[in-house]
Amino acid sequence: MSARPSLPPLPAKPAGSPRLRERPAPVGPGGEDAYSLLLRPQLGTRKVARAEEAGGEEGKREAEAWTRRAAASARRGGELRTEEPPPPAARLCCLGGGCGGGGGGGQKVSATASIPFSCKRALLTSTIPLSPPAKRRGIRTWGHPSYLTPSPTMRD
């Protein structure tokens, strides 16, 4: 007999790290594996799922209420998207078609290139009024000096 005891054979991988195919599948919040989570109907929001899992009849009622509200909100959003969008501001001034917008006629080019200067001036001068603090500071909207009146701070 030999003086050295025989050692057991070494394992191929350490015992703490199972092979990839031996690893358990990810488990969902209800103890389900990933495949069954994919197959079950989606609840839409985490809040609905938690309310339903919270249990009882009250959780189920709350989840149904959230689902109804989400469906109503989606319907309202869908109705809004089907409405005709308002015309762009650049096309409002040219009803005769001279600049390519509004009432037809004219060549369709980029919005700023197709607007005559008279319309551009009207668009530039009809801006949102300044806030009272901006008026006190004398801030003006920038534009062409020929049609902007000088502010009190710009006068000599």
Curated annotation (Swiss-Prot):
Extent of Basic and acidic residues compositional bias: 49-67
Annotated region described as Disordered, given as residue ranges: 1-89, 129-156
Biased composition (Pro residues): 1-12
Superkingdom: Eukaryota
Protein name: Putative uncharacterized protein SERTAD4-AS1
Native species: Homo sapiens (Human)
Taxonomic lineage of the native organism: Eukaryota, Metazoa, Chordata, Craniata, Vertebrata
